[in-house]
Amino acid sequence: NSDAILSASSNLPFSVSESRVEDKMKILPIPKKVRYEYHLVKVVHLSTKNHIGPAEYLCYVDANTGELLMRKNDIKFESLQANIHVEGEVYTTNPFNSSSIVDLVDLKVRHNNIDYYTDSSGQVILPSNNGNATYYLEGLYSEVRTNGNIPSFNAPASNNNILFDNTNSTISERTAFYAVNNIHSHFKSQFPTFNGLDFPIETNVDISTANCNAYYSSGTVNFYAEGGGCQSTANIPDVAYHEYGHAINDYRYNAGAGMWNGGLNEGTADIWALSLTQYPVLGEGWYLNDPNSNVREYDSILKVYPQDLVGEVHADGEIICGAFWRTYENLGSMQQALDLFIDLYDAGPDGPNGTEGIIYTDILVEFLYSDDNDGNIFNGTPNDLAIVDAFAQHGITLLSNAVLTHTELDESLQSVNIDVDANITLTYPWALDNAYCYYKVNNSNLWDSIPLSVVSGNDYSAQIPMQNSGTVVAYYLSLTDVYGKKAAVTPFSAHLDKHPNLPYFILVGYELEEEQDFDFNIGFWDVSHPSDNATTGLWEIGVPEGTFYDNIVPVQTPSQHTFQGAYCAFTGNDFTGGSIGANDVDG
C-alpha cells in the first residue's frame, strides 16, 4: 500500500497530511478507440491543502503496474468573483492645472477571452479572480490609438484596484479616453434614444506629422503631439469635446444628413464643448509658455454679424456660439439653453458658406419656436426677450437676413427736400416693425430719424428736410424688428457708438470744380514724392491686385470705385504672396 500512496501523491505540489488505501480493489474501464481497457486499481485517498483551501483527492492506482491513472479533488469550491475598480491619472482641464485620479468608465477588460466593461463608477465584476485580466484604453465609446497601437497591460484578476498611469500609458492617451467618454455621456444626456454614436470612435493621440491642432474626420477624432510651442492637444479635454461635437453634427444633425455650413459646424461644436464645461473659454492653456492662452473665448470677445463675418469658419462660428452663450447667461440655466439648441438638430437650418445671415436668423427663429408654449410665436414666447437680446448682441435679429438696397446719394440741391429711396426684401415680413433713415448735419453728434414709408411693394422712401448750401449731411438706413432691435444697417456698423463705420455723406449746394478718379478725369496728383524714403508701400496709380491673408482675409481690394473704370491709387501691388504689411503705407 505504501507504493500505491507514493504513486498517488506523485507530482502533487502540496504536502499530504493524511492517506489511506481502501481494502477492496475496483475495476476501472478506460475507453480506447473501439473498446475499453479494464484495469484493476487500488483506491487511494489523500488529504492536503492547495492554494484555495483544503483538498481531498480520490486517486486510482493500477494494482499491477503502480501507474497513477486518475486523481481528482472531491472538494468543490465556489469560484470567487473579482470586483475591480479602474481609474487613471488625467488632466481634467489643461496641463497648467494639477492632474487628477478619475474613474475610467466604459473601459474594456478582457478575462478568459471574454470582454467586460467598467460601469459609470469605474467598477467591473469578473466571474472569477483567477488568472490575469487585460486592461485597454478602449471601450464602448472610445478607442485610443498612438501610432496605431491601443495602450493595454495585464494584471492579476485578484487585484481589486487598477491604475492607468505612466507605467502603462501616457497622460495624453488617458486624458483623451476620459474626455471622449465625457462628451459622449453629455451628448447622450440630450439625445438618450439616439444610438448612432454608440460605438468606440477612433481616438488618435500624439500624431507627429504636425502640431498645434486637432481635427475630426470620417468618424475619428485626432490630436497632434506637443510641438511648435503648443501642448499635446489631447491633454486639453475641451478640445476633444469640440472635435466630438463635429461627430455629433455629422451623425445627428438634420436626421443624420450632416451639416453643410462651415461656420455653423464650428460654432455648434464649440457649443457642445462650452455646454459641458459651462466655462466661456475654449482650449485654455493652449501654449506651453502661457497658462492664459486659449483657442477662443466668449466672455470678453464679442463677434457681431455682419462686420465680423470674414469667411473663416472658426471666426464665423464664434458669432452663433456667442449668441448661444449669452442665451445661457440671460436664461441662467444651461439645460434650458440646451433644450432650445438640441431642437436645431431636427429643424436642421443650413446652407453653403456665405449664407450665415440667413442661417443664423433661422436659428433665432427656431429658438423662439422651441421656446413657444401656445403654437403662436407672433404673440411672444415665455423667454423671447432673453433670447432676442442674446442674439442681438451678436448682430443677429429677426431681420438679419433682410436685404436693404439703396443707391448712395452724394449731392443735393440747396433748399429742397432730399429724397432717400430704398428697396427692402424680407424673409419674415411679420418681424418688421419699421424702417428708418437716420441723419445728422455737419458736426452734430445727434442723429435724427425719419421713418421710411412704403411707396409700393418692396419700395420705400423718406425725405431728409431741406438744407442750406454748404451743409454736409451724414445718413444711414436701418430696419427695426418687433423687439426693437436694429438690423440691415446700411452702411453696416454706421450706427455704432464705438468704432463706427462711415455713414453716407451728402454735399448740399456744392458745384463740382475738379474731379480726380484716376481713370477718365486725371488731375495733377503726383505719386512717390522725391523726398519719400520708403522702400515699399509707395503710392502707385494702376490696376489694383487683390491680396488676401491666408487666401481669406482681404488686405488689398481687387476693385476700384469709378463706374466702368479700371485704375485707382494704391500702396504697391504685391504679386509675390509677401507678408500682409509688405506694401502698407508705413513703408
PLM feature spans:
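Glycan-association/targeting regions that enable binding to alpha-glucans and other polysaccharides
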Residues: 387-527, 531-539
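Edge beta-strands of extracellular beta-sandwich domains
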Residues: 142-158, 486-494
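Segments that shape or occlude catalytic/ligand-binding pockets
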Residues: 1-103, 110, 117, 188, ...
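Extracellular glycan-recognition surfaces and repeat-rich motifs
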Residues: 511-585
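Exposed beta-strand face motif in extracellular beta-rich ectodomains
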Residues: 40-42, 133, 363, 471-477
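Glycine-centered loop-to-beta-strand initiation motif
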Residues: 112-135, 139, 147-151, 456-460
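Surface-exposed loop/turn motifs at beta-strand-loop junctions within extracellular Ig-like
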Residues: 48, 137-141, 479-483
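Extracellular protease catalytic domains of secreted zymogens
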Residues: 151, 156-402
